[in-house]
Regions:
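Feature activates predominantly on carbohydrate-active enzymes
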Residues: 80-316, 321-331, 337-339
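Residue-identity detector for glutamine
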Residues: 26, 43, 55, 144-147, ...
């Protein structure tokens, strides 16, 4: 089978098939669980098969002492984990879970075993290595909703639990409709021809790393449409973490309110609000309020990455860049905490990446002052996303030494070095592959999204994976990617 569970004991070579199989769910009713099991039952029906017919599938709401004893009898070690599950597969299939969120993970394992011909009488016990198993994406365009749901179904199949969704200007703001209006105008401008962002950057000598006109497919969806997507995810135990760009990457706000822009030179590309202007926070917090009202999130990613337009207005020029950055994050942190929301931030501006650019030299657009000393002054209950993790363990040591918990962002598992060692030594919650492009199949393939998601899923649920197994796992993931894509995306 594709996954390598913590414990797998095969008791016979007979194949399980489904014929008039009854589902007995002792947990809370779940139409999604029933639908997922019925997919497996219908797709793997074999009434003329001479092997073992599964008569009933039972779903039990707790790991009983008998199940824990069964784990030990089979040579396993029980570990309490809210996402853990046990399977006893035979004439009847029994699913035991610690918490209802584990049910779909158990069902996903059954489906995978059935589809790959590995569903035989056996006992399986499993729980994830990584507590955060996420995927970072843009909001889909209205015409992409079916494809978006197809991707969520894939996350369920490969036992993910997080979707990080960049909001920006791609969701309706009822209090500030001008944000959406200017967002569409901005996206149309950037989409005039390929790589218009780089053209504009060079034309205006503008310090900027990226722009995201793909978000919402260059438009925006209504709050009701967003709630439909949220419901789809929630029903499948996928937690959505809104990614709400703050300070930097704020073009969706700044375009509509150029009076708060730190950059006056180019009204088309002001992407940073002035942290010395109180109106910046009035607008930013209005945006947070609407997003909190729609999503009811446990946590929000405030971004703050690629902060390059630093200290250009008269007020900000008088301040230390480290203080500017620190005060902005703390102000945002305090506001979200007052709303009961935990805070995630990007980590690139918390790192000393070297270089000798100075702040006191008044050259035009030719320096970005360092802000990394602020890491000692920030609240340590924030989670920091390290998307420089591909450069090695040195990228995360200073952040771990400061006391932050980390996530690996822009995760590319096939080339990532020492996953096992680094996640054992540091406070690493997990990782997230990222999609910075559209949802169409051709882009998913070109950008290796299917491959990265499946490879990541394999190591999120595998305690034995290390660098020595890369070649073996690469081949296994390539085969599985081909199988899944052709079954569910074509």
């Amino acid at each position: 089978m594709f996954f390598n569970p913590v414990l797998y004991k095969k008791s016979a070579t007979d194949k399980i098939f489904f014929y008039e199989t009854e589902i007995v769910n002792e947990c809370a009713d779940s139409n999604v669980v029933t639908a997922e099991l019925n997919k497996m039952i219908v797709e793997n029906y074999a009434g003329d098969c001479s092997d073992v017919a599964c008569e009933k599938i039972y779903i039990h709401p707790e790991m009983t002492d008998d199940v824990i004893a069964m784990i030990k009898e089979h040579g396993g070690e029980y570990k309490k984990n809210d996402e853990g599950f046990a399977l006893l597969i035979g004439k009847e299939i029994h699913i035991w879970v610690e918490d209802k969120k584990g049910i779909l993970f158990a069902v996903a394992s059954l489906r995978s075993m059935a589809e790959t011909g590995d569903l035989t009488p056996s006992f399986v016990y499993d729980y994830p290595r990584s507590s955060v198993r996420g995927y970072r994406v843009f909001i889909p365009g209205r015409e992409q909703f079916d494809q978006f749901k197809r991707i969520i179904d894939m996350l369920v199949y490969y036992k993910y639990n997080i979707l990080m969704l960049e909001i920006g200007g791609a969701m309706e703001y009822k209090k500030h409709p001008e944000i959406n209006e200017k967002w569409v105008e901005y996206c149309e401008y950037l989409s005039e021809f390929p790589n218009k962002c780089a053209y504009h950057r060079n034309k205006f000598n503008h310090v900027r790393d990226s722009a995201h006109p793909e978000n919402g497919k260059g438009s925006f969806i209504t709050q009701e449409e967003m709630k439909e997507l949220i419901r789809y995810c929630e029903e499948r135990n996928i937690e959505i973490i809104p990614e709400v760009p703050g300070l930097s990457h704020c073009e969706y706000i700044v375009m509509a309110h150029p009076e708060i822009s730190e950059l006056k030179r180019s009204s088309k590309f002001g992407d940073t609000y002035c942290p010395s202007n109180p109106k910046s926070y009035e607008l930013m917090f209005d945006v947070f309020d609407e997003i909190i009202d729609v999503f009811k999130p446990k946590r929000i990613n405030i971004d703050h990455d690629e902060y390059n337009i630093v200290g250009y207005c008269e007020e900000c020029r008088k301040k230390n860049p480290v203080d500017i950055y620190t005060e902005d994050i703390i102000k945002t942190y305090n506001y979200l905490k007052s709303k009961g929301v935990e805070v995630i931030t990007e980590g690139d501006k918390l790192m000393d990446v070297g270089g000798g650019a100075g702040y006191n030299e008044p050259g035009d657009w030719d320096y970005v002052p360092p802000t990394y000393p602020c890491r000692d002054k920030l609240p340590k209950d924030m989670t920091v996303i390290n998307w420089y993790a591909g450069f090695g363990e040195k990228s995360e040591k200073p952040l771990l030494e400061c006391g932050f918990e980390l996530l690996y962002g822009n995760f590319r598992p096939a080339t990532f070095e020492d996953w096992k060692g680094r996640t054992e030594r540091g406070r690493i919650e997990g990782a997230m592959p990222a999609n910075w492009g559209p949802f169409e199949n051709v882009y998913l393939q070109r950008n290796q999204q299917i491959f990265d998601l499946i490879y990541s899923a394999y190591i999120f649920w595998n305690f034995e994976y290390d660098d020595s197994k890369k070649a073996e796992v690469f081949d296994k993931v390539a085969e599985e990617s081909f199988r899944y894509y052709n079954k569910y995306f074509e």
